Design a protein with these regions (language model features):
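Bacterial N-terminal signal peptides
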Residues: 10-21
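A catalytic-pocket lid/entrance helix-loop region that shapes and gates access to the active site
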Residues: 160-164, 257, 261-360
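Alpha/beta-hydrolase fold nucleophile elbow
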Residues: 235-248
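Short alpha-helix in the alpha/beta-hydrolase fold that links the catalytic acid
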Residues: 255-256, 369, 373, 480, ...
Length: 558
């Protein structure tokens, strides 16, 4: 689930909610059909040499009064590496092996010239009775972190079944329940939910160092190889293909757009960026970095509007209009004021502080004390302090009592919006994967896992940024459509920051026309809010329609 700025990554690289490298190897030779067993449990295979059995089950779902028949496939694909071709040059390798271990590795490699490196767990949904399955759209989905499984999208967004929440996304009392998803996308696209290595049930093989998968480029390469392998195993090279990432998953998706084209010649029809962060400079609150203070301000305003903390004239406006006014101020007067720093005249500083107070509901005195800068953490703990409540980071509609009411302490607070969904989704998945998908494993399903230190490679001490990967892919592929979803109450990946990053990609007019933004009155996981989930599906239908109904583009006309 979470996406964390660099200063917090060392201790917090866990979940939710980032082109280079060689391949894991040539396509595996086993026929997929030989590994499938309908409606029978698939036990985790501890032998690295064996191809795991996939559990395939048949289901029927009613959507808009019509039966939707489909098959679900749960299990692993094994990522393998050709000798002398590491995933990414300079990536972490396995610890030094003994002579006996080396002999075993040589024996395994001798079978097909490939060494098993990791098992990637996935759940795929494929519609039945399709005239030409090869032509049916296929959407690959993953969450972020880094260190998050795909459970959030899988159990709350577009799969056929979902964890039951209230219409606003609140958790009901346990025991939790599953229900049919009225907003599933399966009537429009087949779906594949991917758990990156070290998350969910995905693991490296014995003697393999998980760190070789824990990095910006390493992660992109491993998910890219999974997509290639799944596409080949299931004869889907001619299918329209979409990649959907959420949070840090958008960082990964943008990187994949260029990697898949360059490494495998796999050109996508669309990229969906849910709660986008392509440039981590927009999230890192430091005194010398003005970007996050500017980028978060409109989200502070919409959050304050939701909690009725603004003046009467602003409260009377729709949230979209409040967002527009805050954008204008943030991108003009506020940007200039921060740029002037210590040279800003006192009178102008007073004026800016008053405007900041007007848009955020926080006292002007607080802004004056803090050089006109309020971080996200301070905002979470300050807006409702007089009520002894804190805000949700992922969804600022959610509030909770403070750990230390009646004090100014704000350390070690929790996220009420995270707590609202983690329990229901985790319980729902662990029951669903066994009871309905017939997949068995005794290892824990890691919804989030600490994958630090995360290797940011070329970013070094700078900021990870895959916006340029996306720019290159869009420039080379004129048919690549990009859809960015933004939420007004998302205080993890603010909408104005996402807009600014995309606006700075230096695209020509024709290429820029392939971009679209949609907005939701929800939080980071927009789909837990029932009205937003319904809108999300409708917006996907419009996006898919445009992505699949394009006319050939003459290169001379570009």
């Amino acid at each position: 689930m979470p996406t964390f700025p660099l200063s917090r990554l060392a201790g917090l690289l866990l979940a939710l909610s980032l082109a280079a490298g060689a391949t894991f190897g040539a396509e595996m030779k086993a026929d997929l059909k030989a590994t499938l067993k309908d409606d029978k449990p698939a036990k985790e295979d501890a032998k690295a040499e064996e191809e795991p059995v996939l559990s395939v089950t048949a289901h029927t779902l009613m959507v808009n009064g019509q039966p939707l028949k489909y098959h679900a496939t749960a299990g692993y694909l094994i990522l393998k590496e050709e000798e002398g071709k590491p995933l990414v040059k300079g990536a972490a390798s396995a610890p030094a092996a003994s002579d006996a271990d080396k002999a075993k590795e040589d024996e395994k490699r001798a079978k097909d010239g490939l060494t098993p490196k990791a098992k990637v767990f996935f759940v795929a949904y494929t519609l039945d009775d399709v005239a030409d399955p090869a032509k049916r759209p296929l959407t690959f989905c993953f969450n972020g972190g880094p260190g998050s499984a795909s459970i959030w999208l899988h159990m709350a967004a577009m799969a056929p079944r979902r964890a039951r929440l209230t219409a606003d996304g609140e958790a009901p009392p346990p025991p939790y329940q599953l229900e049919d998803n009225e907003s599933t996308w399966l009537d429009q696209t087949d779906l594949v939910f991917i758990d990156p290595v070290s998350t969910g049930y995905s693991r490296t093989f014995p003697k393999e160092n998980p760190a070789q998968f824990h990095g910006l480029k390493e992660d992109i390469a491993s998910i890219g190889d999974f997509i290639r392998l799944y596409t080949s195993r299931n004869t889907r090279w001619l299918s329209p293909k979409i990649v959907l990432g959420e949070s840090y998953g958008t960082t990964r998706a943008a990187g994949l757009s260029d990697y898949l084209q360059g490494r495998y010649g796999l050109y996508l029809n669309g990229i969906i960026l849910v709660s986008s962060v392509l440039n981590f400079q927009t999230l890192e609150f430091t005194p010398q970095n003005n970007d996050p203070y500017i980028g978060f301000l409109p989200s502070y305003a919409t959050t304050a509007w939701y909690h009725q903390k603004l003046s009467a004239d602003l409260q009377a406006k729709p949230v979209a209009e409040v967002a527009a006014l805050a954008r204008t101020f943030a991108g003009t007067d506020y940007t200039l004021a921060l740029a002037r720093g210590d040279t800003l005249p006192a009178a102008e500083k007073q004026r800016i502080a008053a405007e900041l107070s007007r848009f955020t509901g926080l006292p002007a005195k607080l802004y004056l004390q803090r050089r006109l800068r309020v971080s996200d953490a301070l905002f979470f703990s300050s807006l409702l302090r007089d009520e002894d409540k804190i805000l949700g980071r992922y969804d600022a509609r959610f509030t909770g009592p403070r750990y230390e009411p009646g004090t100014d302490a704000s350390s070690d607070e929790y996220d009420p919006s995270d707590e609202a969904v983690t329990g229901p989704l985790t319980a729902a998945f662990n029951d669903y994967v066994r009871r309905e998908l017939k997949f068995e494993s005794d290892i824990p399903y890691e919804t989030t896992w600490d994958v630090s230190p995360w290797n940011f490679g070329d970013a070094g001490s700078g900021f990870p940024n895959t916006a340029d990967d996306l720019r290159k892919a869009m420039t080379r592929n004129p048919y690549l459509k990009i859809w960015v979803t933004c939420s007004y109450y998302d205080l993890a990946t603010p909408f104005f920051a996402a807009e600014n990053v995309v606006a700075s990609m230096n695209l020509d007019a024709a290429t820029r026309a392939n971009l679209r933004f949609t907005y939701y009155e929800a939080g980071h996981m927009l789909y837990i809010h029932q009205p937003s989930r319904a809108k999300f599906k409708a917006d996907f239908g419009a996006f898919l329609h445009d992505a699949l109904r394009q006319q050939p583009v003459r290169s001379a006309a570009r």
